[in-house]
Amino acid sequence: MDKFLIDVTVEIPKSSKIKYEYDRKTSQIRVDRILFGSESYPQNYGFIANTLDWDGDELDCFIFADQAFLPGVVVPTRIVGALEMVDDGELDTKLLGVIDCDPRYKEINSVNDLPKHRVDEIIGFLKTYKLLQKKEVIIKGVQSLEWAKKEYQVCVDLMKQYGKLPKDEFIAKMQKLHPEHYQK
């Protein structure tokens, strides 16, 4: 099986309660908020440059690793699957990957190779981390590596075609052109 390697820029270290977010306009990682509840990120979390997901931000990725990485660090990541998710009415895919330069993860090549409990931790986190904000997150399913590759390519194409639009304009345009990706 061919490896699907991508550089992922870390926004949020594993175990953090701080929600950092990349700002494409300024090319900086900013503090977005402190999580409202007692949750913390179960794995490192970041974005993939030159991609645009349906929520108007770069495509997101959880990186399974034993270490917590600093915001802004680029981690070579082997993508193994994805979570298909709807966040506050917008499709917001989360790719799932493992650090590629750690031999402890060399045997993990698909989402089925990950410990189920670790995937369930991420699902549980995503279902609950916005409850106190009164926002709904729906996990539609755990998806395969092939599905993740296709979603990645869609997000690369969206960035090429619409990446210069402000986020609000992009979402408004996509809601008209592709209402199937929005539940508002």
Curated annotation (Swiss-Prot):
The yes or no answer to whether the keyword Repeat is present is no
The EC designation for this entry is: 3.6.1.1
Subcellular location per the Swiss-Prot or TrEMBL entry: Cytoplasm
The protein's annotated catalytic reaction(s) are: diphosphate + H2O = 2 phosphate + H(+)
Instruction: Provide the primary localization.
Output: cytoplasm
- Give me the residues that bind Mg(2+) 1, please: D55, D60, D92
Q: Does the keyword Metal-binding apply?
A: yes
Cofactor needs: Mg(2+)
Looking up InterPro entries in the UniProt record yields: Pyrophosphatase, Pyrophosphatase_sf
Per UniProt, which keywords does this protein have?
Cytoplasm, Hydrolase, Magnesium, Metal-binding
Listed under GO biological process in this entry are: phosphate-containing compound metabolic process
- Entry GO MF terms: inorganic diphosphate phosphatase activity; magnesium ion binding
Name the domain of life this protein comes from. Answer: Bacteria
- Quaternary structure and partners: Homohexamer.
User: What family is this?
Assistant: Belongs to the PPase family.
Function (record text) = Catalyzes the hydrolysis of inorganic pyrophosphate (PPi) forming two phosphate ions.
**Name this polypeptide is given:** Inorganic pyrophosphatase
